[in-house]
């Protein structure tokens, strides 16, 4: 899948994936992932569910055959993902209460002062089980260590008793430990740092820019440089990850320490500076950046979600923005709308690529799925019409750009998608300057969603929908 970071490659790919795919009908779900054009699929191993509720007096926690572990659902998930031709990405998420060192550990999903030795043992067991050499199970190469450690919702403590931020320092120790465990099983495994939440919330959440600076022992707001010391020899991971949920459109930047779509460039610049300073120990010369979660709730079904036409347009623009700044992989959260279970619509997750049906097989695709599968944008300006897109299968070939004139689609220009399916170019035309009309791309008989010449400007909108009623 990922052979080298985009910045050093002759071509710049944008691999696509779907995150948090899990369901009883997982084989059907994976066919829907494939239908969305994605090659990567992501799910958590919930450590607190796999491990026993109490720490056994005598056991082998690093042994993949330890009988007190319950791997049944993960085994099936991995088998079905690989059988479907997908590349699995497993995230170790949460922790059992006995692996947490806080006096009061309230949740398996938001570990509090997690014991690095316990994390190492479980990560070793998981990586050995899915090494390709255990019990006939397929290999998993991509491993992510925890979830959103800059958010108090998923990682504690964020601050010590004096109010000093400590989560980045704590996570550095855990990440280095996780890296050692995963690489100790197979040095060609790929370790992904936990995806960071996008927005700073005083007293609860540390903004991802600040968190990353502290994690990597860097300083500066725009011109990044190393802080004093050697950062304990550096931070060990292969790929960095962000969840740039955006409280607006694809150009929205947020605050100084936030990372939303419009400010992805800041995080790329920080990682580049950290690479140059030798702060990151990675198998790549330039650290790749993945978006492992991103989406907006759609309307319908969320009455406070983005209208479907806008979400569809913004999804294509989001993928273009990601590719332009050098993102290597873009995951949509998630495959199907999650059941509200009595929660308000702005809290429930209705950002799926599919409307949820009675069964996975009965799910229906949303319009946004087709923009995710075959993203295409066309922006008019005084020098012509600039276009960009990615073919549905991420492969090369001839792409015909068409424009809508007098109610009919007419050929405008033929382009060539490169070996990873990216095509772009400029059509020297005045078409679209009056903000009328639309363009689309056609690849091997498949049409992209038409992209209207009338732009949709940025406006405030919560990613999971506005409160309604």
Task: Annotate each predicted stretch with a short phrase.
Residues 58-60, 144, 149, 154, ...:
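Aromatic-rich peripheral "rim/lid" segments of glycoside hydrolase catalytic domains that contact
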Residues 9-46:
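Boundary/entry segment of secreted carbohydrate-active catalytic domains
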Residues 421-425:
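Short strand-edge motifs at loop-to-beta-strand transitions and within beta-strands
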Residues 53-68, 99-114, 136-137, 152, ...:
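Surface-exposed intrinsically disordered loops and tails
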Residues 27, 31, 120, 124-134, ...:
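Noncatalytic carbohydrate-binding groove/subsite architecture in carbohydrate-active enzymes
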Residues 1-9:
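Secretory targeting and sorting signals
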Residues 36-206, 247:
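Substrate-binding cleft and catalytic face of glycoside hydrolase catalytic domains
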Residues 14-20, 39-43, 88-92, 143-145, ...:
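Hydrophobic faces of well-ordered beta-strands that scaffold small-molecule active sites
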